[in-house]
């Protein structure tokens, strides 16, 4: 579902539909100009109660031994950059010099967007010691397209900033 035929924020989407085959071997899911239905009900198939489509709310208390399957890291496992046991009930990220704009593994735990419209929030304990340290919420499309709402430090002390990263530029 591209936005204005330029960007696709949700990545790949998979739809499951019954398939029929024509006499000449082509698969089809609908007839003529029929629309693909939003929901296809199949006899004997029950909806998973943990399904995350439509309107839903997701909260994580980070009280398990491992991150849930909905969480992921960027590019490769971030082994050693986060902990669930250092402070039980919290996800602890370790400050690292790698940013999400680099093609390396940053201290970044995320989940994929599932809707074009959403709300997200977090609670955070963070005391930056230098201008180089920042933590917050990152909306990441790729290395050149991001929004970063961060707590950091400037000449006056702790500060909050919103940075737009686009086409190699960074705007505050």
What are these model-predicted stretches?
Residues 2-9:
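Short, conserved, GDST-rich strand-edge loop motifs in beta-rich repeat architectures
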Residues 11-16:
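Short edge beta-strand segments in beta-sheet-rich domains
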Residues 1-2, 165:
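Short, loop-centered acidic/histidine patches that primarily coordinate divalent metals
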Residues 17, 21-172:
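Extracellular glycan-recognition regions
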